[in-house]
Regions:
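N-terminal regulatory/sensing modules of transcriptional regulators
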Residues: 1-33, 149
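Conserved binding/recognition cores within well-folded domains
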Residues: 26-128
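Short, charged, intrinsically disordered terminal tails
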Residues: 140-149
Length: 149
């Protein structure tokens, strides 16, 4: 039996899905499924001595000093070795953008922007460079317009 037939046989699930679709539409369901998938993706922090695995959705921002990257998460700070440009290639699809020369930030963790400062949900204040400001502001505007849908 295929999955769609199983869903229609379960009245509770079928009703919940119908309600969701009538309120948010098919694109809302697609976005919800993508968000669920993204929230469960894992990110590896590796140094010579340690190996840590964190969920991408729990990362607040990454900060680089030389080739040492500090990965700030809701559970603490993890270390890894690498380059910020390589990390951006991996994390951009999950809503990470460059805030300045040495910081990548998760757009969903930005609470507000005040002049050249990005304020995060954990009350961290990060400098936003003039060269990165347009992309950060556009990403926040897109986030706000998605939330209004």
């Amino acid at each position: 039996m295929d999955l769609l037939q199983e869903i229609t046989k379960d009245n509770t699930l079928s009703n919940a899905l119908s309600s969701f679709l009538s309120f948010y539409g098919p694109s809302g369901l697609s976005q919800a499924m993508q968000l669920y998938t993204d929230m469960n993706q894992e990110y590896v922090c590796r140094t010579k001595e340690t190996l840590s695995i964190v969920r991408i959705y729990e990362i607040i921002y990454l900060e680089i000093h030389g080739h040492n990257i500090a990965v700030h998460t809701v559970h603490g700070i993890y270390q890894k070795y690498g380059s910020l440009s390589d990390e951006l290639k991996v994390l951009s699809r999950y809503g990470f953008i460059k805030c300045n020369q040495s910081v990548l930030v998760a757009v969903h963790k930005i609470r507000s922007i005040q002049q050249d400062t990005v304020i995060l949900t954990d009350d961290t204040y990060l400098h936003m460079s003039r060269s990165c400001a347009p992309k950060v502001i556009m990403a926040i505007a897109a986030k706000v317009s998605q939330q209004e849908l």
